[in-house]
Amino acid sequence: MASVEEKVKQIIVEQLGVDEGEVTPNASFVDDLGADSLDTVELVMAFEEAFEIEIPDEDAEKIRTVKDAVDYITAHAKGGK
């Protein structure tokens, strides 16, 4: 079973079409990975679906880096899925 970090990286690579090597913990979705506002919304939706969680808009706005996503999902995922 993939770790949360591995799964998050996989989703980012698929959604943004970036190289896996670019997806580092401190990589900003917008500044480093070239995401626009629509991309970030789609990323959050993909995280919600993959990890079976609900991410409120006010929390989604705070998820700006790979580490932010991993930390949020780790704290909120049901049963670590």
Curated annotation (Swiss-Prot):
GO terms for biological process: lipid A biosynthetic process. 4'-phosphopantetheine is transferred from CoA to a specific serine of apo-ACP by AcpS. This modification is essential for activity because fatty acids are bound in thioester linkage to the sulfhydryl of the prosthetic group. It comes from the Bacteria. Pathway: Lipid metabolism; fatty acid biosynthesis. It holds the Pfam family PP-binding. It is found in: Cytoplasm. The modification O-(pantetheine 4'-phosphoryl)serine is found at S37. InterPro entries: ACP (IPR003231), ACP-like_sf (IPR036736), PKS_PP-bd (IPR020806), PP-bd_ACP (IPR009081), Ppantetheine_attach_site (IPR006162). Residues 2-77 form the Carrier domain. Belongs to the acyl carrier protein (ACP) family. Carrier of the growing fatty acid chain in fatty acid biosynthesis. This is Acyl carrier protein. It comes from Koribacter versatilis (strain Ellin345). The gene is acpP.
